[in-house]
């Protein structure tokens, strides 16, 4: 049996791995998340690489899985909203438009000395939102921990009529692609303890 280390403390990422039956050990990297990359794909890959490599330095063996996600909209990377005002501005900006959830993933296999890095993109289509709807959402949701101030798995779901791409990517872990990459390395879900 092999060990899989999740370089994240994200409840959502843990839930996704739990849902598919993937056994893992939580080992968050605790790095300061700084990237100088402007392109959202490069930005997410850079941060997922930093996290995975920080964990790899502390281990002799294992498979490390790391991810980083952002919302990309009209040439800007939108980070987690820190205030109600920031969440309001983000949701107002996204209203009636399409934004892109980008997740960079790094898998470092210390057993085979291999590394895989990829990104996934999903288009998220928002309904037109009234000020009343935005204010209701902000008062009734834990927006402060969410990229661009929203979570498709929460109350925002009522404002998102469709997506193009992987739903789980929006949540921060494109699990189908992760599984395909683990298979390329020769692993099955049941290989991890």
Model-derived regions, located:
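A short beta-strand-loop structural module common to alpha/beta enzyme folds
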Residues: 25-33
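N-terminal beta1-alpha1 ligand-phosphate binding loop
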Residues: 2-22
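Cofactor-binding loop segments of dinucleotide-utilizing enzymes, especially the Rossmann-like FAD-
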Residues: 9, 29, 110
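Anionic-ligand binding patches
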Residues: 2-4, 26, 40-193
């Amino acid at each position: 049996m092999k060990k899989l280390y999740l370089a994240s403390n994200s409840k959502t990422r843990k839930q996704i791995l739990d849902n598919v039956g993937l056994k893992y050990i939580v080992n968050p990297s605790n790095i300061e998340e700084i990237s100088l990359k402007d392109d959202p794909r490069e930005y997410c890959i850079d941060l997922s690489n930093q996290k995975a490599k920080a964990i790899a330095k502390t281990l002799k063996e294992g498979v490390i899985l790391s991810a980083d996600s952002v919302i990309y909209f009209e040439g800007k990377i939108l980070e987690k909203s820190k205030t109600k005002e920031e969440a309001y501005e983000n949701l107002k900006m996204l209203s009636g438009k399409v934004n892109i959830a980008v997740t960079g993933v790094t898998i470092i296999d210390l057993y085979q000395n291999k590394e895989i890095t990829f990104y996934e993109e999903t288009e998220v289509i928002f309904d037109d939102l009234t000020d009343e709807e935005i204010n209701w959402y902000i008062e009734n949701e834990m927006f402060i921990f969410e990229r661009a101030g929203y979570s498709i798995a929460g109350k925002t779901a009522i404002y998102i009529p469709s997506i193009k791409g992987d739903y789980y990517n929006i949540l921060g872990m494109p699990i189908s692609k992760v599984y395909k990459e683990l298979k390329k390395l020769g692993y099955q879900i049941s290989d991890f303890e």
